[in-house]
Amino acid sequence: MAAISRLPEQGTLEQDQSKKINKEAEALINSSSYWDTDDLAAPHSIKDGKEASKWLEGYDEEARKVLQQVAVAAWNYFTAASPITKQHLTEAEDVARVFLKASAKQAQQFEASALEDPIEQKELNVISKEGLNALDAKTLARYNSLLGNINKIYTAVDVCESKEQKVCIQKYSDLISTIQINTDGPHALSIWKSWRSAVGQNLTEIYEKLVDVTNKAAKLNGHEDAGEMWRSAFDMIDAGKKEKMYDVAKATEAAYAKILPFYTQLHAYFRRQIAATYKSDESLVRDGPIPAHLLRSSTGDDWSAAYEETKPFDQMDKLPEEITDNLHKQTMKSRSMFVKVFRYMRYLGFEQLPDSFWKNSVFSRIWSKDMICNPATAYDMINGTDFRVKICAQIGQSDFVEAHKLFAQLYYKFLSSEQPFVLRDAPNPTISGAVAKAFGILATNVNYLKSQRLISPDAKLDQASLINELYHEALSSVVKMPFSLIADKWRYAVFEGKIGAANWSDEWWGLREKYQGVGAPKNTPEAQYDAVVAAEISQQHAPASRHIVEYVAQFQVLKALCAHSKTSLSEGCIPKKETIMRLIEVMKKGGTISWLDALEQITGTRELDAGPLVEYFGPLINWLSSTNEQDAVFLGWDGEGEKFKPEDIPRPRSENVADRPSIPSDDQIAYPGGNCAHGQECLLDTTCNGTICVCNAGLFTLQIGDTYNCVPDDPANAGFRDGSGLVIAITPNNQTKNGNSTDGDAASNEDSTTEPPKTSDSTRPALFSLLLLFAFVLSSVLMF
């Protein structure tokens, strides 16, 4: 990579940290009265509504200037990562923090109830929250340092796979890939113990300090503890008044109870299937919890690595390959694939996008730059006309589905752009995320795919393929629900001081066994560190409930969009235009309504309801129930520890590779760091280690974010060093929309049709919303 050798001439972050290079951002500091914190009035002492309204008007203009610098710097960094673009982003974020802290102090002077407009009241309340910025500079720096140290442990600590290993060079990322392909029980246990032994004690000490600092920030914001502060985004607690309009902890517990019968069937089937893989592991019994080290993931919140040897049916689904083939036959490129999806969105009733969308978006990887490809993300550049997406798309079903999700995210930003600046985008990121995921399911509907000539007119999704697809989804996502519930229950108890560090392990494993049916490996002292080594606990210092809310809500949104469809919910639908128009009206309101209002206006209920989720997985649930009954499988994990009998254990499976094409499609190739677990061919000087593409011997791995490159020289010598801080990926919200999309013109005449626009064979991200920016900068709730 030629750019490596030139980087030293440009300087490194270590050399330039004291020298400010983002002049545009620096010039904004103290450029108006909104940065001033001297001689402020007492909180809520200004009761003149007109004065408060005028202040909000000026704030709107100043905030745009500041956050536009963040948006531009973020775009430049994620599309062309380098020490220079990273420093530009860091400095823009630092300037934004100064502004947000100062403006929050100013906003606190005003009495919100003096404003006649309820939207202005909400606007003022959002701005006045300090969150973590309520900490003094020294304590805030300590908080950031603690997070940085946690990240260093995850990236820098060397771990042995076994006690016999003399030279330990494996990192956390190496262990993850090894765990996913490991089918040897003792070896899996050795890796499981080694990681916890290597980092557990250090992480425990750091996490205790992190809890203390986060609780201090919560109290400064009027909350009892950090758990209450985290929940406030969903509970909508007004600190001080203590009026709880919703109990998200109770709601997520109810959602778990609703899916528990399904989860129990899934757990029982999976436990029996992996017994064929781990026959010699006596810790796996037919009626008890599954030992955590046998789940093929670092924390046991994703079981999909065992999909191939446990899937219900051996046959392969041919539709993804057919979709990919037909996209190629239509001479599709990444950009034209997005044009195809955009025409569908236009058919459904969504508006034209500005010309800038097609001019400025990045649809495929730019190989001359070090792009950070993941996550694929929708951006609002804050200038009123510029909305973009960034994705390293490949032609195939996966990114065809991703395109639908990105458009849904982008339209939430675009359509709400006429709302006050801090109330643009969804009222809570879980709502926009749920809508986006629902559109991802719509993209797989057979009738829609036929209309796009992506599958043959007589193609059908057979029952076996559907059940396999639902099973894979359940292993990767449904099993996360109890783990996320546990993660928050445990942390809330820690924040509240109900359990001390000496009892952390007992509480953690009690919750894991009760809710997840997962147990600690026997006679392993290292298990005491299991909670703090979980990335969702220490690395992702934010409430896990947001995952449950978003995941459950996506099926509620899907059911609302498919209310008039005759197909099963599992198959998606082509929504009616009047249904989409109701969704569009909700999107236009942005954050001026609460997340519960948005949920109600989209789905018809203000409750988080897992019923549609259960309906969606209905075919799989019925199959699991029948199969488990036929095989006399024990349901639950509260048995006496009965061992599997030989006749209880199914035959081992092997992957069916008979029908792989000799020339791989885009879905069957992978790049450095990419997934090759299903036979993808590794490109660009890499070899498959069984799970991911790793650099060939003699090459160095350069990792920037989630993007990997294989280079001949040590990247550390070229200015790429492991930093101690977190890069905040910020995507601000929308503004006024102007201009028409030239690429979408062909879709504008399709609105009167009764089917999605047909095409001939010749037709060619948790980044954060603006509220997340305020959240991240202002509080841990911000971390939503």
Give residue spans per PLM region.
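N-terminal helix-rich structural modules
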Residues: 4-7, 11-208, 535-545, 592, ...
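C-terminal, non-catalytic "cap/extension" segments appended to globular domains
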Residues: 22-24, 34-52, 84-86, 235-240, ...
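Active-site-proximal, well-structured secondary-structure segments within enzyme catalytic domains
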Residues: 166-178, 209-390, 461-473, 479, ...
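Post-HExxH zinc-binding segment in Zn-dependent metallohydrolases
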Residues: 248-259, 426-462
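Short pre-active-site segment immediately N-terminal to the catalytic Zn-binding motif
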Residues: 387-403
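Conserved N-terminal segment of EGF-like repeats
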Residues: 661-739, 743-744, 779
